[in-house]
A protein has these predicted regions:
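Hydrophobic alpha-helical segments, chiefly the membrane-spanning helices
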Residues: 1-327
Length: 327
């Protein structure tokens, strides 16, 4: 069987199983009483399982360029497709400034730390510790918003954080409304996760073979082909929410997806397997991700959202990224 046919079949199986996994995870989360923010974070992790698995597979095989570029290339695609294309289709994505600072601040912290790991300025293990130092409290606040009152922070800061979480929760509550699941949903989720992992491994292997036969570089295989294909479901969902005025949902989906990619798909395996010396393609992908994220958040904060022009800028930025890694 040709690598192209194997790749296409693996992609279809991966995406189909991912959709099934996400819906069942949502139902299980509803049964367990997850907050809307935690449910969104959990489903983002489930939705990211293809790119995370592909990245881990590549790093385990010693294909650093593919492993790094799948994760960070997917993040560049998310910014362009979820935020950029979403703003173009919807006309405008309105965003609460507190949500931009709260969620965006965590994303900038993780992106900067990931950049430090890619460039070997910070070791993977140290980078992982730095990211977890911020991500654990963020996840805890998503799960138990009331815990902020017991952290000993000033009352004014407590009120601000609670307001940011409330702004995010208010939109997520209307966007995420799964029925309460049972043991059958949990069983289906476990089976779907296994299928996603196996199909993603096949997808990464076949993409590498296909790219080699076509003369593509490893960064094109990982940062453009695998990254774009595995992120398509997130893009479709984000465009839907953007067109229905759920701006905070789009921002949370894009940034939480990116955060989990860096954490689970890059830093955790890098801390275990090591990274070696940075290569020029790795640096191009990493700098494009950090730069486009900074542009997106800055424009969103100043304009209290993203209009069509901002969306075009992000999409053009992705086009420049594709050209840069392809030459």
């Amino acid at each position: 069987v040709s690598p192209v046919v194997t790749f296409v079949v693996a992609v279809l199986v991966t995406l189909g199983s991912s959709v099934l996994l996400v819906t069942r995870i949502e139902r299980v989360g509803a049964r367990l009483g997850f907050t809307e923010a935690l449910l969104g974070l959990t489903t983002a992790l489930a939705a990211n399982s293809p790119e995370i698995t592909s990245a881990i597979t590549a790093l385990a095989r010693g294909q650093r360029d593919i492993g790094v570029s799948v994760v960070l290339g997917s993040n560049v695609f998310n910014l362009a497709a979820l935020l950029g294309l979403g703003a173009i289709v919807a006309g405008r994505i309105d965003l609460h400034r507190r949500v931009i600072v709260f969620v965006g601040g965590v994303s900038l912290w993780i992106a900067a730390t990931g950049l430090g790991a890619v460039t070997s300025v910070i070791s993977p293990i140290t980078s992982l510790a730095i990211v977890l130092f911020v991500f654990f409290p963020y996840a805890a606040l998503c799960a138990w918003p009331g815990v902020v009152r017991r952290l000993g922070v000033p009352p004014r800061t407590t009120k601000w954080i609670q307001g940011a979480i409330s702004d995010e929760e208010s939109e997520l509550a209307t966007a995420i409304h799964p029925r309460r699941g049972d043991w059958r949903d949990g069983t289906v989720a476990i089976v779907a996760l296994g299928v996603v992992v196996l199909a993603s491994v096949v997808m990464e292997h076949s993409a590498s073979s296909m790219g080699a036969s076509l003369g593509w570089s490893s960064v094109v295989i990982g940062g453009v082909v695998l990254a774009g294909v595995t992120s398509l479901p997130n893009a479709v969902a984000a465009i839907y929410f953007a067109s229905h005025g759920r701006g905070s949902v789009v921002l949370s989906e894009a940034l939480n997806s990116n955060n989990l990619n860096v954490l689970a798909g890059f830093l955790v395996p890098a801390a275990v397997l090591g990274l070696g010396h940075p290569t020029p393609p790795d640096l191009v992908v990493a700098y494009f991700y950090a730069g486009l994220l900074l542009v997106a958040l800055s424009v969103a904060y100043v304009g209290r959202g993203l209009g069509r022009l901002a969306g075009v800028v992000l999409v053009v930025g992705y086009g420049a990224f594709v050209i840069a890694v392809s030459t």
